[in-house]
Amino acid sequence: MKITDVRVRKLNDEGRMKAVVSVTFDNEFVVHDIKVIEGQNGLFIAMPSRKTPEGEFKDIAHPINSDTRNKLQKAILEEYEKAKENNSNKE
């Protein structure tokens, strides 16, 4: 699968959650609500999830290997940095 579009839908300056992103694959399939989070070791992505009745969060969709996760994270963080830069230029 090829990442064909990354859209940063919401940018946040405050808090740990920095952005909400949608990613399109092969111009045919989209995953919404991927979050860009600021952690102790820098930025990372959190896949869309839901809370189970037991209070545990489970991913709705996620990469099944680390290579795919790394490609996805790289594409998202690159687009996030561009969106952040464009947003600061508007102010």
Swiss-Prot record:
Name the keywords, alphabetized. Cell cycle, Cell division, Septation
Species: Caldanaerobacter subterraneus subsp. tengcongensis (strain DSM 15242 / JCM 11007 / NBRC 100824 / MB4)
**Pfam families linked:** SpoVG
User: What protein family does this chain belong to?
Assistant: Belongs to the SpoVG family.
Query: Does this entry carry the keyword Cell cycle?
Result: yes
- GO terms (BP aspect): division septum assembly; sporulation resulting in formation of a cellular spore
SUPFAM superfamilies listed in its UniProt record: SpoVG-like
Which InterPro entries does this entry report, sorted A to Z? SpoVG (IPR007170), SpoVG_sf (IPR036751)
| Keyword Cell division listed | yes
Q: What is this protein called?
A: Putative septation protein SpoVG
Function, please? Could be involved in septation.
